Amino acid sequence: MSNIIKQLEQEQMKQDVPSFRPGDTVEVKVWVVEGSKKRLQAFEGVVIAIRNRGLHSAFTVRKISNGEGVERVFQTHSPVVDSIAVKRRGAVRKAKLYYLRERTGKAARIKERLN
């Protein structure tokens, strides 16, 4: 029984997901439905958390919009997510960057990873 479930989940997983880590700046393009129209919307920010659970994997992206912090959780293999592009690599030493929620301005900056 579990082999069938694993096989079905494997078929539904996206193959073109780039590798990214917490601290990286990513641009996620998401399909948005407004009335009868369907369009792509970009959400660019810093990855503050990743949850690896196979088909149920998710990641949290944080950005500052009009001086207000906005966080959005994306399901990695969701059909709503069109593409994920890594804009900048960040050098951090923690897996969850929740401390960035309390920081603003220059204190919330992340060093760039050079390799």
UniProtKB/Swiss-Prot annotation:
UniProt GO molecular function: structural constituent of ribosome
Matches recorded under InterPro entries: Ribosomal_bL19, Ribosomal_bL19_CS, Ribosomal_bL19_sf, Translation_prot_SH3-like_sf
UniProt keyword Membrane present: no
One example of a Gene Ontology biological process annotation: translation
GO CC terms of this entry: cytosolic large ribosomal subunit
Keyword Transmembrane helix among record annotations: no
Pfam families (UniProt xref): Ribosomal_L19
Keyword annotations from UniProtKB, A to Z: Ribonucleoprotein, Ribosomal protein
Family: Belongs to the bacterial ribosomal protein bL19 family.
Its job: This protein is located at the 30S-50S ribosomal subunit interface and may play a role in the structure and function of the aminoacyl-tRNA binding site.
Identification of the protein by name: Large ribosomal subunit protein bL19
Source species: Citrobacter koseri (strain ATCC BAA-895 / CDC 4225-83 / SGSC4696)
